[in-house]
């Protein structure tokens, strides 16, 4: 019998029923809830006279709409936007009504859903994990089958603890070799997207493997899996190993005592078999990857920091040529312009991609002893959770950022998306550690450039993009 991929094993172990139409019913182990995609789901339960099927499989926190400034200490009433305030209050009310564990806005455990799940040990190897957010793929870094779902599916999972889904194809992205000094997980995943495009992973679950992936920390792997959706794949996976086990051990939701020993033994099988067959294989040489910067309005529009913006006149494909022309116009850039000549207005270090303690440490190394350039209007650092914030402060990272001229904020999704007060003005260029650079993503007319935390910090102190390796 042919070997199985990691994705195959996870799928098969959660398959409840295969349906005649090609879809299947799978069991969901963990459901993470936030304020934006859950109100209608809870109301649907209420109207149908149902209750959540398994209370302890759910955890919740507000993140998308919460302000990151100190005023939020005043509670929900401090949220200025009426819709945002209502969504956060509704999440609190729904979780209180049904007894669902929620880390409310001013709880130290509050944070971005894809930070607090792993941080609490609520994400474990071998699990199925869903959330009403497309970057749920983040949790695949633990050898878990994780992906985003829509609001109607949120209701379905709440009511039944199951989900109707179709099995995906298998893609292997193998990154072998040693990363050059100063090159990070964010650079790997941007390079992958640049290679295969934003549709490259459509219909696939991507397993990231190879020596360069194994060398990454668990937090680095989360960054990789987080952006699998930007490569077109709803699911990103990294096989569980000793790093995974060490990260999870002792966390609040992790198994204890004898159950822990049994779990660790079971997790050893969460790898693709040596003879497993993948539908698509993509290979990258880690040694060839440089610090990356997105220049356009799609994550696939990405280049190494030492390259120039493309010239549409040199593009033979008419569709691609038109997209380059449109992106250049929106971004206010010129053909053949050097990436290092792009002048910046704001810098954002945060998001579910890059707001964990290792990300903040990497940025602080660059910020230490330097000052934010006078041409930068604002540079903000937004920890991914209250616990990340507390850890960073215990290490003195907040002081490094503040002394350099950065703003040190409360946890939340912040400037990743224009659903809270942190946003760009039209025409502003932002070096951002987030995951999407679509038109208007960070604010109407805002121009987003995706980079690693270290590259963002380097841009902040330089006023433009520079090769971070020159500052280390």
UniProtKB/Swiss-Prot annotation:
Cofactor binding annotation: Binds 1 [4Fe-4S] cluster per subunit.
Molecular-function GO term, any one: 4 iron, 4 sulfur cluster binding
Source organism, top-level taxon: Bacteria
Cofactor(s) the protein needs: [4Fe-4S] cluster
Ligand binding ([4Fe-4S] cluster): 352, 413, 416
Keyword Metal-binding included in the entry's annotation: yes
UniProt keyword list: 4Fe-4S, Amino-acid biosynthesis, Branched-chain amino acid biosynthesis, Iron, Iron-sulfur, Leucine biosynthesis, Lyase, Metal-binding
GO biological process: L-leucine biosynthetic process
Reaction it catalyzes: (2R,3S)-3-isopropylmalate = (2S)-2-isopropylmalate
EC number, UniProt record: 4.2.1.33
A Pfam family hit: Aconitase
Pathway the protein contributes to: Amino-acid biosynthesis; L-leucine biosynthesis; L-leucine from 3-methyl-2-oxobutanoate: step 2/4
InterPro entries: 3-IsopropMal_deHydase_lsu (IPR004430), Acnase/IPM_dHydase_lsu_aba_1/3 (IPR015931), Acoase/IPM_deHydtase_lsu_aba (IPR001030), Aconitase_4Fe-4S_BS (IPR018136), Aconitase_4Fe-4S_dom (IPR036008), IPM_dehydratase_rel_enz (IPR050067), IPMI_cat (IPR033941)
Gene3D superfamilies according to UniProt: Aconitase, domain 3
Family as reported in the entry's similarity comment: Belongs to the aconitase/IPM isomerase family. LeuC type 1 subfamily.
Self-association state and partner proteins as the record states: Heterodimer of LeuC and LeuD.
Function: Catalyzes the isomerization between 2-isopropylmalate and 3-isopropylmalate, via the formation of 2-isopropylmaleate.
Protein name: 3-isopropylmalate dehydratase large subunit
Protein source organism: Pseudomonas fluorescens (strain ATCC BAA-477 / NRRL B-23932 / Pf-5)
Gene that this sequence comes from: leuC
């Amino acid at each position: 019998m042919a070997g199985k991929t990691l994705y195959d094993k996870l799928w098969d172990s959660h398959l409840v029923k295969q349906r005649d139409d090609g879809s299947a019913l799978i069991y969901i182990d963990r459901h993470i809830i936030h304020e934006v995609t859950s109100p209608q789901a809870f109301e649907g339960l209420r109207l149908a006279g149902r209750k959540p099927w398994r209370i302890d499989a759910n955890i919740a926190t507000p993140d998308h709409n919460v302000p990151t400034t100190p005023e939020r200490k005043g509670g929900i009433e401090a949220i200025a936007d009426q819709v945002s305030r209502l969504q956060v209050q509704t999440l609190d009310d729904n979780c209180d009504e049904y007894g669902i564990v929620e880390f409310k806005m001013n709880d130290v455990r509050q944070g971005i859903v894809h930070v607090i799940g792993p941080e609490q040990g609520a994400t474990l190897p071998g699990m199925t994990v869903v959330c009403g957010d497309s970057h749920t793929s983040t949790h695949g870094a633990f050898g878990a089958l994780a992906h985003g779902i829509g609001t109607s599916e949120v209701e379905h999972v709440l009511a039944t603890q199951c989900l109707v889904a179709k099995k995906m194809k298998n893609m292997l992205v193998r990154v072998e070799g040693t990363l050059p000094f100063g090159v990070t997980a964010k650079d790997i995943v941007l390079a992958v997207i640049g290679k295969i495009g934003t549709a490259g992973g459509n219909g696939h679950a991507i397993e990231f493997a190879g020596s360069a992936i194994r060398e990454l920390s668990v937090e680095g792997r989360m960054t990789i899996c987080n952006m699998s959706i930007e490569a077109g794949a709803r699911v990103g996976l990294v096989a569980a190993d000793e790093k995974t086990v060490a990260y999870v051990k002792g966390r609040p939701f992790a198994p204890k005592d004898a159950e822990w020993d049994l779990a660790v033994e079971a997790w050893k099988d969460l790898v693709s078999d040596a003879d497993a067959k993948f539908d698509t294989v993509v290979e990258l040489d880690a040694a060839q990857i440089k610090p990356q910067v997105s220049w356009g309005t799609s994550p696939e529009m990405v280049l190494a920091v030492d390259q120039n913006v493309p010239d549409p006149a040199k593009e033979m494909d008419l569709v691609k040529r038109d997209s380059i022309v449109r992106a250049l116009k929106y971004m206010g850039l010129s053909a053949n312009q050097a990436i290092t000549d792009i002048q910046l207005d704001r810098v954002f270090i945060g998001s579910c991609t890059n707001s964990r303690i290792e990300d903040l440490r990497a940025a602080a190394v660059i910020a230490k002893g330097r000052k934010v350039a006078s041409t930068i209007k604002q540079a903000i650092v937004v920890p991914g959770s209250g616990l990340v914030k507390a850890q960073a402060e215990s290490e003195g990272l907040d002081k490094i950022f503040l002394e350099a001229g950065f703003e040190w904020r409360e946890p939340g999704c912040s400037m990743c998306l224009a659903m809270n007060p942190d946003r760009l003005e039209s025409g502003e260029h932002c070096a951002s550690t987030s995951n999407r650079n679509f038109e208007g993503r960070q604010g109407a007319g805002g121009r987003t450039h995706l980079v690693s935390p270290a590259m963002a910090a380097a841009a902040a102190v330089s006023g433009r993009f520079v090769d971070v390796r020159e500052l280390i």
